[in-house]
Amino acid sequence: DLAKQRTAENPVFYVQYGHARVASVFRQAAALGLDRADVAGADASRLSDPDELALIRSLAQFPETLEHAALEREPHRVVFYLMELAGDFHRYYNRNRILGEDRELARARLLLAANVQKVIRAGLQVLGISAPDTM
């Protein structure tokens, strides 16, 4: 049964795992002395990697996606959006070192990750699905 599978083929698991992955990054950051408060003043202009820019564009689409899903009574739009966002973040995570030696770049990347997590959490909440910090 797909709904019970803990694999990338299960869209709920895949999106929840994206949320949990960001939480894991923040646990690692805390071990390095960085917390969410440090992220608030991060310089987002440090984000120039194509994967980072794609994530930023994707995040900007969330309000419009929610609006269209509500107006058209098509909740699957939110599901598809979240799957794409989670996929983009998983790719970004696998290609880039979020917590590298450049502390200012790490802060900017954590800011991006925090916003991905915030949008995933909000989207899952709209769908009535939990957003776990660990899996």
Language-model features: locations:
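Non-catalytic interaction-recognition regions
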Residues: D1-M135
